[in-house]
């Protein structure tokens, strides 16, 4: 019930921002202009008689410390906001702070009867008590919206979630701080009064002005080119914000309610006592109370006079008593202004602190240090510092001159001398390149061990290039194949042998792709023109409604082949392995080989006296072929104990099936089985894809379904899924050869909506063989692309989730590519686009000169 009330309040503020803002500003102006007289505060709130002797050095030290803490706390909060990486959150929080300060100042001056000089302490208490965390959470709720219409709903949802907690916290804080106003200590009473006013102002502004202003700012933001709001396109991508994290602890809430009830009784007793005294009919008793408790004269909270200096008295009328003034109003104003501008020791301390923080922020806080990861609904944010580099080299040119790393001496040493040096503690690193080449040529050093022998991977690669150039007479063939400034330590023993360089492949980016409520920019490593542009167009068409994806199966496979003496033993072994208890024993042995590999089932086929056993297991975030091989080997050893006459012919019997087209992968699945769907509105098909629903359906049926069936295709019921799969595989360090099975895809299209003018499109990919750890994913460029997608490495909280997310991204990107290419075919734009984007600048004879893109 309470949540619904707060939701309705939030919906009203977000739906009527102008009305709420104008009403709030009007009330603020009224506080500044209507009835300037101070309120008659209850006893204990500031009417106790004080003497100037109370303001000593200890008071100044305490207040200076409070001011410093307030400044540092405010600096910490805004630095924390800047780490979120969103200029919108930072600006909105700043606006919230400024407006709250303005309302607070108005409240202090009017309702508490304070003068302007009190603000220098009141504002510091306001800064000390303001909490921007809830304001930030509400801003994140709003910024997580994927459209302008969703902003109001998300603001209402945020108010419904945060409102009850903030209301209870405000009540508790006000009552707890209000206890200080019962102390009878003048200074503590005034400070507590400021604090209570700060808490109340923060609450009122947060519940009224802030959500309305938040809605208005985002409503006035211009839309990006992709049709998304500008603040949604330009903000860093943020991870999902779970609502459970914002729900209060019910036990803590009950304790707060009980505490509030008790404190209310204390304050009620005090107010009843004060009211009874105020209504006391006996004037003598009233005077006795005033003499011992309070006086009718109210002084300012802070003394501007030093010891021994008299303050000009102010004429105050309180009841029947009159205090004469011995100075004019102009003299008083001039006096207080001069005292305000006087630089005292506490002012100097605050000024030094502010200057130090400013210098630290400007000169010592780099942008990289302020980048972190934050979670929000459907966004992803990259947390690692960004350092822009050339392609694995520090120089703009990636060509490597073909010359030795060291100049050889005038006369080379003999083979025996070189061997002696090589076997010594100094090692081959003390030899020149020519001497190492001589040892390789003579067979004393294996060519594949050059990096290890010379103890410098880059030098070893350079020497191997020289040997290859000389023995194969390549001349300058390797000049444009770079090899310098690459981290070969991650390559050795993991990715490649006999390395002679690395191959720079252009990496384009398509996106953002609206996948399951997230915006993802997808890297595509390809040398095919039009591919990135076409995929990007498909993503733009899918932006409004987004793509929905699901993982329907997960299991990497390894299919060994074993042989028995006869079919009787083969069939008996097959039936034995299918018994649940025996399978559990096989699974126990299989699972013992890895922390992540878990055998889920086995699929057995008999061919004569041969058994083809397909082990299917989940492998966490790894692609898992090595895990499967190791587990399969141990599991077969256990089966062999029961059937000693079983002969293991091969650990892979092509029943996996790996890197070959196979119906078993298409039917049973391998790796991640993913399904994606999307709805494309009719106006998008016409404006972005330049075609119609009927034309798309006709081309899809005749090309992808009938044409593939005529060709006898297995899993090839698509337009060009392999294009996108391979491009993502190369960019993210997957095994490119596995695009054979991973590209199995069926693309389906059908009319959608009441009038059938919209398009429903889906892609089913049953065998995406993919992982985020191991293999080429450890290489820095490939790891950077995984980082870009937010799936680098293993997922510690939920093993396998990163690999599943990457598989979903692949399928969603394939859907975008399919949609764009099919539209080009339906509209007859395929040849035209390839002639423009996929041709060299040199025109063929008889063709028209190409038109520059900037003039098209």
UniProtKB/Swiss-Prot annotation:
Its EC number is 1.1.1.34. InterPro entries: HMG_CoA_Rdtase, HMG_CoA_Rdtase_cat_sf, HMG_CoA_Rdtase_CS, HMG_CoA_Rdtase_eu_arc, HMG_CoA_Rdtase_metazoan, HMG_CoA_Rdtase_N, HMG_CoA_Rdtase_NAD(P)-bd_sf, HMG_CoA_Rdtase_sub-bd_dom_sf. It catalyses: (R)-mevalonate + 2 NADP(+) + CoA = (3S)-3-hydroxy-3-methylglutaryl-CoA + 2 NADPH + 2 H(+). Residues 836-856 are annotated as: Disordered. The chain crosses the membrane at residues 12-32, 89-109, 123-143, 190-210, 344-364. Belongs to the HMG-CoA reductase family. NCBIfam families: 2A060605, HMG_CoA_R_NADP. This is 3-hydroxy-3-methylglutaryl-coenzyme A reductase. It comes from Blattella germanica.
């Amino acid at each position: 019930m309470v949540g619904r009330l707060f939701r309705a309040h939030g919906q009203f503020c977000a739906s009527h921002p102008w009305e709420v803002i104008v009403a709030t500003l009007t009330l603020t102006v009224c506080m500044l202009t209507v009835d300037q007289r101070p309120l008659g505060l209850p006893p204990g709130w500031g009417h106790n008689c004080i003497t100037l002797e109370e303001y000593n050095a200890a008071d100044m030290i305490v207040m200076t410390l409070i001011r410093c803490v307030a400044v540092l706390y405010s600096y910490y909060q805004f630095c924390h906001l800047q780490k979120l990486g969103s200029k919108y959150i930072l600006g909105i929080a700043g606006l919230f702070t400024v407006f709250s300060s303005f309302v607070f100042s108005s409240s202090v001056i009017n309702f508490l009867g304070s003068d302007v000089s009190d603000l220098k302490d009141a504002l510091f208490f306001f800064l000390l008590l303001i909490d921007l965390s809830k304001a930030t959470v509400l801003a994140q709720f709003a910024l997580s919206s994927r459209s302008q219409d969703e902003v109001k709903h998300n603001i209402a949802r945020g108010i419904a979630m945060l409102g009850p907690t903030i209301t209870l916290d405000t009540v508790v804080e006000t009552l707890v701080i209000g206890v200080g106003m019962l102390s009878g200590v003048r200074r503590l009473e005034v400070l507590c009064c400021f604090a209570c006013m700060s808490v109340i102002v923060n609450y009122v502004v947060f519940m009224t002005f802030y959500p309305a202003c938040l809605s208005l700012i985002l409503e006035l933001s211009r839309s990006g080119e992709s049709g998304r709001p500008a603040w949604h396109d330009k903000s860093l991508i943020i991870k999902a914000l779970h609502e459970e994290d914002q729900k209060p602890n019910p036990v803590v809430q009950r304790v707060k309610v009980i505490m509030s009830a008790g404190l209310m009784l204390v304050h009620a007793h005090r107010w009843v006592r004060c009211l009874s005294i105020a209504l006391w009919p006996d004037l003598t008793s009233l005077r006795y109370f005033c003499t011992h408790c309070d006086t009718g004269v109210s002084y300012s909270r802070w003394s501007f006079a030093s010891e021994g200096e008299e303050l000009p008295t102010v004429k105050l009328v309180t009841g029947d008593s009159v205090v004469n003034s011995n100075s004019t109003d102009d003299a008083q104003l001039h006096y207080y202004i001069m005292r305000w501008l006087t630089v005292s020791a506490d002012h100097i301390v605050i000024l030094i602190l502010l200057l130090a923080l400013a210098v630290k922020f400007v000169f010592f806080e780099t942008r990289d240090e302020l980048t972190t990861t934050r979670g929000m609904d459907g966004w992803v944010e990259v947390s690692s510092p960004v350092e822009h580099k050339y392609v694995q080299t520090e120089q703009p040119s990636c060509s490597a001159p073909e010359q030795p790393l060291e100049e050889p001496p005038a006369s080379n040493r003999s083979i025996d001398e070189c061997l002696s040096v090589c076997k010594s503690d100094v090692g081959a690193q003390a030899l020149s390149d020519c001497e190492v080449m001589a040892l390789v040529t003579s067979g004393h050093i294996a060519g594949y061990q050059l990096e290890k022998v010379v103890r410098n991977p880059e030098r070893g690669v350079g020497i191997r290039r020289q040997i290859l150039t000389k023995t194969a007479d390549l001349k300058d063939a390797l000049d444009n194949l770079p090899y310098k400034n690459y981290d070969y330590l991650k390559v050795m023993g993991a990715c490649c042998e006999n390395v002679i360089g690395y191959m720079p492949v252009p990496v384009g980016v398509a996106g953002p792709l609206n996948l399951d409520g997230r915006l993802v920019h997808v890297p595509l490593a390809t040398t095919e023109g039009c591919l990135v542009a076409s995929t990007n167009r498909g993503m733009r068409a899918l932006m409004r409604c987004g793509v929905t994806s699901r993982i329907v199966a997960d299991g990497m496979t390894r299919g060994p082949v074993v042989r028995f003496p006869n079919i009787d033993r083969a069939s008996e072994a097959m039936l034995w392995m299918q018994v649940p208890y025996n399978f559990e024993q096989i699974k126990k042995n299989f699972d013992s080989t890895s922390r992540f590999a878990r055998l889920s089932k086995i699929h057995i086929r008999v061919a004569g006296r041969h058994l083809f056993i397909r082990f299917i297991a989940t492998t966490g975030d790894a692609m898992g072929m090595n895990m499967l091989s190791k587990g399969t080997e141990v599991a077969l050893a256990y089966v062999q104990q029961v059937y000693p006459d079983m002969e293991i012919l091969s650990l892979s019997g092509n029943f996996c099936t790996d890197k070959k087209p196979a119906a078993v992968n298409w039917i049973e699945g391998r790796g991640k089985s993913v399904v994606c769907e999307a709805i494309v509105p009719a106006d998008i098909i016409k404006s972005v894809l330049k075609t119609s629903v009927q034309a798309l359906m006709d081309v899809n049926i005749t090309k992808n379904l009938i044409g593939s069936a005529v060709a006898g295709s297995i899993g090839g019921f698509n337009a060009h899924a392999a294009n996108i799969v391979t491009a993502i595989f190369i960019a993210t360090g997957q095994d490119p050869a596995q695009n054979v099975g991973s590209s199995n895809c069926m693309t389906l299209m059908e009319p959608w909506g009441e009038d059938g003018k919209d398009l429903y499109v889906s892609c089913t990919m049953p065998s995406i063989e993919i992982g985020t750890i191991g293999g080429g994913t450890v290489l820095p460029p490939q790891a950077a692309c995984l980082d870009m997608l937010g799936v680098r490495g293993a997922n510690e909280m939920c093993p396998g989730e990163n690999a599943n997310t990457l598989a979903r991204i692949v399928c969603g990107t394939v859907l975008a590519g399919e949609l764009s290419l099919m539209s080009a075919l339906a509209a007859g734009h395929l040849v035209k686009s390839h002639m423009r984007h996929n041709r060299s600048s040199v025109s063929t004879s008889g063709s028209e000169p190409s038109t520059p893109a900037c003039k098209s």
